[in-house]
Swiss-Prot record:
It catalyses: L-methionyl-[protein] + [thioredoxin]-disulfide + H2O = L-methionyl-(S)-S-oxide-[protein] + [thioredoxin]-dithiol; [thioredoxin]-disulfide + L-methionine + H2O = L-methionine (S)-S-oxide + [thioredoxin]-dithiol. This is Peptide methionine sulfoxide reductase MsrA. PANTHER family: MITOCHONDRIAL PEPTIDE METHIONINE SULFOXIDE REDUCTASE (PTHR42799:SF2). Keywords: Oxidoreductase. InterPro entries: Met_Sox_Rdtase_MsrA_dom (IPR002569), Met_Sox_Rdtase_MsrA_sf (IPR036509), MsrA_MetSO_reductase (IPR050162). Its EC number is 1.8.4.11. It comes from Salmonella paratyphi B (strain ATCC BAA-1250 / SPB7).
C-alpha cells in the first residue's frame, strides 16, 4: 500500500485474512520474569497505543505496581497478524501495549496520566516520524469504568492543552477493546534486549489535571 493509503483505516471487508495460530512468545517477561500471559488474582489489564510499541512498553514496565507488559496489536480486524502485515496498514491494528497492573498500587487514572503526558495525541495516523495507521493514539477500555475514565481524562487533557495555548484537537481513538494479539517475541521488551534501540515517543509538555 502507498503511504497515502496507510493514513486511512482499512475496512473490515478489505482487511487481510490472518491466521488461527497465535504468535509464539516467551513464557516470562524478559525484565521482571513475571508471566507474559497470566493475570494474578486482584490485578487488572489496560491497553494503550501511543506510537511505536517498543518505547511505550518500556515506559510502563518501569512503573511500580505494573506486573507485566506486552507489545502487540489491537483495534483491528486481522486475527493473529504479523508485524509486517500490521505495518502494511491492511489489518486495521494499532501497535499497542498490554499492561497487567495492581490497582492497589497504581490506579487506572495514574496509567492514563502516563498515557496522555508521554506522547502527542493530536497527530492522527502517525506519531512523530512514524507514519501509518498502526501508530495512531488509542485507548481500548475493558470495562465501563475504564471507558468513563478514559473519556473524562481526554476532556481534561484537551482543556489543559487549550489553557496552555495549544488548540489542536485530540485525535485519540477511545473504543471498547477488541482482541489483543501478541507481537512476535523479538518485539517483546525490545528496548531491554536492545538498549540503544529506537524510541520515538515524547510528550507535548502538558500535564493531565487531576479528576475533580
Amino acid at each position: 500500500m502507498s503511504l497515502f493509503d496507510k493514513k486511512h483505516l482499512v475496512t473490515q471487508a478489505d482487511a487481510l485474512p490472518g491466521r488461527n495460530t497465535p504468535m509464539p512468545i516467551a513464557t516470562l517477561h524478559a525484565v521482571n520474569e513475571h508471566s507474559m500471559t497470566n493475570v494474578p488474582a486482584g490485578m487488572e489489564i489496560a491497553y494503550f497505543a501511543m506510537g511505536c510499541f517498543w518505547g511505550v512498553e518500556r515506559l510502563f514496565w518501569q512503573l511500580p505496581g505494573v506486573y507485566s507488559t506486552a507489545a502487540g496489536y489491537a483495534g483491528g480486524y486481522t486475527p493473529n497478524p504479523t508485524y509486517r502485515e500490521v505495518c502494511s496498514g491492511q489489518t486495521g491494528h494499532a501497535e499497542a501495549v498490554r499492561i497487567v497492573y495492581d490497582p492497589a498500587v497504581i490506579s487506572y487514572e495514574q496509567l492514563l496520566q502516563i498515557f496522555w503526558e508521554n506522547h502527542d495525541p493530536t497527530q492522527g495516523m502517525q506519531q512523530g516520524n512514524d507514519h501509518g495507521t498502526q501508530y495512531r493514539s488509542a485507548i481500548y477500555p475493558l470495562t465501563p469504568e475504564q471507558n468513563a475514565a478514559a473519556h473524562a481524562s481526554c476532556e481534561r487533557f484537551q482543556s489543559a492543552m487549550a489553557a496552555a495555548g495549544d488548540h489542536r484537537p485530540i485525535t485519540t481513538e477511545i473504543a471498547h477493546a477488541t482482541p489483543f494479539y501478541y507481537a512476535e517475541d523479538e518485539h517483546q521488551q525490545y528496548l531491554h534486549k536492545n538498549p540503544y534501540g529506537y524510541c520515538g515517543i515524547g510528550g507535548i509538555g502538558v500535564c493531565l489535571p487531576p479528576d475533580a
